[in-house]
């Protein structure tokens, strides 16, 4: 981006849920004059549990922020001023809450990974703060049909991989953040129950 004089836009809505022991996901802010080619997007809705108010942050060059502000003043999803002022005062007091949530989500992700690690039919190809992308081994069955069978017979709601693009037929996206530890521990047995219906 520096060579081509372009902006790299990174959406770090989930940055507070990156596993603490993994360290920073990148070192882009250590590059001299990073703000000339980097735009970081962030949302308070996930970390601080403040959904619906469209509150977030943009970190970049001051001149560019000035231009972005002009656009935001003229669109409907612009964050309302009272909510902006309220959140600004509370942010310093939310650090412990955010850390607790981060640890809770890490525990859930680790349990989910451990639960599926022994499965021969299912493989976690990527896992993040809220979702896991899981590969199934039923090559002769469409993933949307797999998703229907899981919902109807196993009590698992998933999103077929084809919703995310081509060549995703063998994948399902599963949400794990909203589950209890007990529910996560039961996912493997529910997936295995699918064998009865295939």
Locations of regions flagged by a protein language model:
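PLP-dependent enzyme catalytic core of the Aspartate aminotransferase-like
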Residues: 149-158, 164-198
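Conserved core segment of the aminotransferase class I/II
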Residues: 34-106, 110-114, 195
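Short beta-strand segments
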Residues: 9-12, 42, 126, 131-136, ...
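Residue-level detector of structured alpha->beta connecting loops
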Residues: 5, 120-121, 155
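Active-site pre-lysine segment of PLP-dependent enzymes
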Residues: 1-8, 14-50
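Conserved glycine-rich beta-strand-loop-beta hairpin in the small C-terminal domain of fold type I
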Residues: 88, 104-113, 123-136, 146, ...
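Residue-level recognition of strand-loop junctions within catalytic nucleotide-signaling folds
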Residues: 61-62, 92, 135-137, 177-179
């Amino acid at each position: 981006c520096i060579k081509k004089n372009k902006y790299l836009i990174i959406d770090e809505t989930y940055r507070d849920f990156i596993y603490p022991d993994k360290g920073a996901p990148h070192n882009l802010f250590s590059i001299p004059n990073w703000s000339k080619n980097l735009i970081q997007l962030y949302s308070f809705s996930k970390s601080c549990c403040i959904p619906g108010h469209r509150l977030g942050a943009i970190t970049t060059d001051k001149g560019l922020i000035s231009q972005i502000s002009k656009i935001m003043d003229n669109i409907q999803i612009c964050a309302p001023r009272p909510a902006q002022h309220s959140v600004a005062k509370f942010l310093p007091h939310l650090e412990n809450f955010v850390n607790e949530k981060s640890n809770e989500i890490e525990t859930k992700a680790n349990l989910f990974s451990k639960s599926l690690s022994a499965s021969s039919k299912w493989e976690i190809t990527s896992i993040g703060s809220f979702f896991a992308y899981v590969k199934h081994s039923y090559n002769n069955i469409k993933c949307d049909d797999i998703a229907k069978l899981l919902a109807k017979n196993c009590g698992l709601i998933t999103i077929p991989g084809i919703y995310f693009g081509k060549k995703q037929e063998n994948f399902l996206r599963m949400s794990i953040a909203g589950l209890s530890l007990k529910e996560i521990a039961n996912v493997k047995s529910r997936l295995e129950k699918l064998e009865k219906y295939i």
